Amino acid sequence: MKRKMLWSSLIVILFVCILFLNKIVDFIINVEWYKEVGYLTVYFTKLIAICKLMIPLFIIIYISIVLYWRSLRLSIIKYRRAFEVNNDKVKNEKRIFIIVNLIVSFLFSYAFAATYWYRILQFNNSVPFNIKDPILNLDVSFYIFKLPLIQSLHSMILSLIIFLGLITLVTYFTLSVKDKVIWRNFKKDSGKIDILNSGITRFAGKQLAVLAALVMICVSIGYILKCIGLVYSQKGVTFGAGYTDAHVSLLLYKIIAAASIISAVIIFISILVSKVKPIIVSITVIVALILIKSLSYTVVQNFIVKSNQKTLEQPYIKYNIDYTRKAFNIENIDANPFQVKDNLTSQDIDNNMDTINNIRINSFEPTLEFYNQVQIIRYYYKFNNIDVDRYNINGKFNQIFIGTREINTKAIDPNTWQNRHLIYTHGYGIVMNKVNSVTSEGQPNFVIKDMPPQNSTDIKLDNARIYFGEKTDDYAIVDTKLKEFDYPKGSENATNNYDGSAGIKLGFINRILFAINQKDINFLLSRDILKESKILINRSIKDRVSKIAPFLNYDSDPYIVMSGGKLYWILDGYTVSDRYPFAQPQNNLNYIRNSVKVTVDAENGNVNFYIMDKSDPIVQSYAKIFPDLFKDINKLPSDIVQHFKYPKDLFNIQCSVLGKYHVTDPGVFYSGEDLWEVAKNQKQVSGEKYSMESSYMVMKLPNEQKEEMILLQYFNMRDKDNMVALFGARMDGENYGKMVLYKFPAEKTVYSPYLFKQKLNQDTTISSQLSLWNKDGSEVQFGDTIIVPINQSLVYVEPMYLRASGKEGIPEMKRVIVSYSDKMVLAESIDDALQQIFSYKQDYNQENSNESQIETPSYDINAEKLKEAKSLYEQALEAQKNGDWSKYGENIKKLGDIIDSLQK
């Protein structure tokens, strides 16, 4: 018997292992990977939290079901007139019940714990915001850290009660059918079964009444949560509680909650004394109160609030404005008037040459296209993206484009397992060009290019290998018998053996595990894998980072920087919530902070998390939960810190919010008379409108002393093309995260990018020139429209590209259109355009002031010399025709003497 039990147990264990084999393998690999990257404690924090939440939940649910099932059995015995005892049947039922209960309890507890593990951690590690909501006077931390767990527990308990109710109903109907079959409660005088008066029916009624009492307690808690949830109401003028919510809904929710508790007590007592009427009355009262609440809300809203909405809703609109601006971190914007004057001089241009010299004439899309046409070197490389940054290059502060040459394993031909995973393991090199400079052909002027990198800057770059990248999705096996391809080198290829620290050792056991994990037998069959070989997994930057810290949100655009001769990725991490009271949601969230900066070593894959915003309570909570996760940002090398950028994803959300919430006066906000939107533009003069993307610029802000990088966006009046403001985020040094807003005069028409395009189209000289270029197999394309504030003036810049028609045409920057005031110039460079705009204005004034001093004899002498030069030229031509080369040379010499005298 014991041997039989042993074999049965072994079979069950083997079956479970096979059933959960993939989960077991994933767990072992995860443990090895988290250990390799140095965040094993973070992984186990999650697992321990799940266990801490799951085990007590499992016990509570299991015991609750056991107790309830026992009460069912006792009730069945009590209310059935006869009860047959079959010991074998009872044992079988007990075994089945235990198995079912274990499964149900496990599923309930695991599903809840796996989904909400971080909520209990946040509940226990909450950090106060020191901001209270204006309705219930609760700290914002309650809504963000505690309320979600309370709501989740409430939903789970209610689901459990409903589940027990279903068990009761199933039991009732099963026994009722059984009674009918065996003719229990048969009335001899009628020959019918009296189901309604049967013991089974009375049993079911009492069991369901007990559950109804528990449901009423849940209803009471639910209405208390509804009171709290009024800060998220969407019934008023703005998000958050309105007048009717605060004066009607809040009161009646409290009354319903209290009445539900009383009803629960009445129902419970009525069960003990076998009274049905009080139960019906109490439930009827609750239903009536709910109907009264709905009716009262409708009456007050339509007959009191609607006709006096602006006055009654004003304080609640103010709450919405204030809390939305706090939640999206736009309450401390440095707003200044910008007069838009037309008084720039050449001296102003000279004083702002560092701004002028960093205006971007290389536009993003054509530059990325050019990178992928000219600098991939081989077809299996790809530039997935280019990033804007700033570097001190040879002593000058320059805005640049930089791109990484990543391996594109899908393009490898032949795409064999060895090629894809053992040979072509990494990308190689970066390409950099200044945004303000092009070659004579109109192509980006590279300062770092080719393979191996040809570097004309003073920026150190010793290791250009990219094992971890934006789109490096495949695993790589390194330190094998095969040499890794490094980069093409003439007729041969340079090779490399990985000497980084990343990777999990591929011993025999791990080869088996990865063969199962990747569903690939090559791990076991390959003769190239050695005992010291390692596998690099999770090589995509975003996947790697989010696997370590999945509770953070991440920016969509990691960017590469050079530091200490190596390459590092920087990725912005956000703490977000959709639970901030009264704050208007945007993109399914209503609180966001750029609280974390993440760096990833492009060769070793080392990941480091740094707290950027120590004032954020959410990141403080995470730091308490995961004490080994975050590092002090002061320990980060300064040459990485100086490349921190304000992230576009966050800025774009703030721009969307600012379009409405730049208004702080509730009356003006209610009237909707000052709404903004992101400015529109066109790719082509006659093309469709599209919303402008925010752009990084190096410039000197008004009243500032030096240039810095700014993330800038332009605003129009909503549904209009008149520009009303410039909005920017600073990011250099101590100014990181500071916001600036420059408002234009309301009475003045300021050209938006779209109006600038229309003005360009109406310029006869420029439009005719564009028409000439835009034919005969050529196509004119416009780059990024840049509007540069200088002092209190605006300068508009539009690069113009020319490309041969067809897919293989390379875009070349041929001209720059510059507009200032009522002047618009088409030139080969910004310098030429500005020279034309400001020099002819200056020369005109000089001519006017010196007009009376011009001497006529001087003019006559020059005219006589020109006449003589013409005569000599004609004589030289005549001598040439006659073959008199002596006379020809004499005339040409005299002509040269006259030209020399005219130049003096």
From Swiss-Prot:
Chain ranges passing through the membrane: 9-29, 47-67, 96-116, 157-177, 208-228, 253-273, 279-299
Cellular component aspect of the GO annotation: extracellular region; plasma membrane
A Pfam cross-reference name: UPF0182
Highest taxon of the lineage: Bacteria
Keyword field: Cell membrane, Membrane, Transmembrane, Transmembrane helix
InterPro entries, per database record: UPF0182
Main location class: membrane
Membrane topology term: Multi-pass membrane protein
Record localization: Cell membrane
Homology family: Belongs to the UPF0182 family.
Protein name in the entry: UPF0182 protein CKL_0015
Species of provenance: Clostridium kluyveri (strain ATCC 8527 / DSM 555 / NBRC 12016 / NCIMB 10680 / K1)
Lineage: Bacteria, Bacillati, Bacillota, Clostridia, Eubacteriales
